[in-house]
Curated annotation (Swiss-Prot):
The protein's name: 4-hydroxy-tetrahydrodipicolinate reductase
Residues that hold (S)-2,3,4,5-tetrahydrodipicolinate according to the record: H146, G155, T156
Compartments it resides in: Cytoplasm
GO BP annotations, alphabetical order: diaminopimelate biosynthetic process; lysine biosynthetic process via diaminopimelate
Active site, renumbered: H145 (proton donor/acceptor), K149 (proton donor)
This protein's record includes keyword Cytoplasm: yes
PROSITE patterns tied to this protein: DAPB (PS01298)
GO MF terms, alphabetically ordered: 4-hydroxy-tetrahydrodipicolinate reductase; NAD binding; NADP binding; oxidoreductase activity, acting on CH or CH2 groups, NAD or NADP as acceptor
Gene3D superfamilies xrefs: Dihydrodipicolinate Reductase, domain 2, NAD(P)-binding Rossmann-like Domain
Main subcellular location of this protein, as a coarse class: cytoplasm
Amino acid sequence: MGIKIIIAGFKGKMGQAAYKMVTEDPELELVGLLDPFTDEKEVAGVPVFNAKEELAGLEAHVWVDFTTPKVAYDNTRFALEQGFCPVVGTTGFTPEQLEELITLSREKQLGGLIAPNFALGAVLLMQFAAQAAKYFPNVEIIELHHDQKKDAPSGTAIKTAELISQVRPSKQQGAADEEESIAGARGAYFDGMRIHSVRLPGLVAHQEVIFGSQGEGLTLRHDSYDRASFMTGVNLAIKEVVKRSELVYGLEHLL
């Protein structure tokens, strides 16, 4: 029997990519689609729902969520309460919300994943950045995304900064007396480092982590040119979370 999947936010670009991936994998079975704004009642024989409450009692194993930060927390909590293992690519969770969801997953003995990025290359970039920061503590992050992305900085950039801050002491970068002639010119502040967000049409998801030291520099970069790049990670996550009994934050915990 295949793993039964619900996709929330299936009308969005990531949701459409997830739909294609799930329907093309013989080990997965799509049993429900959720989108509050569609008039469709079914797609290729799969029922479509407008409200998550309509999915209560549906026989499913995994809830794949590519919605919006505004509803992702409530969706993930609902999924766990219904016995679905959540695989969530929506960003914008607070540390308190993550802790609440992890606690709930332990109570329910359900695996799950919230990941700022499902591209394996992006996960490796974050790991490489954490390694480099031990030797190059002066660092800035530039993340670049399409102009319809709602949150800034990206979840990937924040996760990268968190990993870096775990391996280097907090430090002030730049001149001690620097001044911004235009507010925000130096980017967002995170534990001594700066994060810069770019939003332009034509982009998908890109990130640079730039390290500087005496007489040398190191730049790490990852590019997602197509949303298909995320689906390898989503597929892996779906097949892994059903074996687990706790929600984790970051795809690296499933690799």
